[in-house]
């Protein structure tokens, strides 16, 4: 989680919303975050589904980063500049729930060419935020 704070700061993310019932921001997080947890706007919420629905009502594009049978490669996806983006990233072990995938406006993935079928959530998020930033700035 600390790495997510550092990355959110690096890319100028408006807000980091962490969802789940067992999220602790302890010493390990603070050490990895290198004090960015003190400057990045964040919230901890129980229900990811409620957060996604609220963001949709506020006009955000809900874009989930997950490999599915219908996801589009991120390098072929065109991010809209005139609508705020909520990038949804999943749990390291379980990914993004089917409910949230169904609620998403778009599902994108990062093409992989090695033997492994997935990559670390933080590294995938870094790649996605780089691509989004490259396109919209």
Language-model segments: which ranges?
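Post-transcriptional modification and biogenesis factors for structured RNAs
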Residues: 1-137
């Amino acid at each position: 989680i600390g790495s997510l704070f550092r990355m959110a700061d690096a890319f100028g993310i408006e807000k980091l919303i962490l969802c789940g019932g067992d999220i602790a921001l302890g010493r390990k997080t603070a050490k990895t975050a290198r004090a960015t947890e003190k400057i990045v706007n964040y919230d901890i919420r129980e229900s990811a589904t409620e957060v996604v629905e609220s963001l949709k009502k506020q006009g955000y594009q809900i874009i989930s980063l997950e490999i599915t049978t219908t996801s589009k490669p991120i390098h072929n996806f065109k991010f809209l500049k005139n609508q705020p983006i909520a990038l949804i990233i999943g749990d390291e072990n379980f990914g993004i729930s089917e409910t949230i995938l169904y609620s998403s406006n778009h599902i994108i993935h990062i093409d992989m060419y090695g033997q492994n079928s997935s990559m670390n959530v933080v590294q995938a998020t870094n790649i996605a935020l780089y691509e989004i930033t490259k396109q919209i700035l």
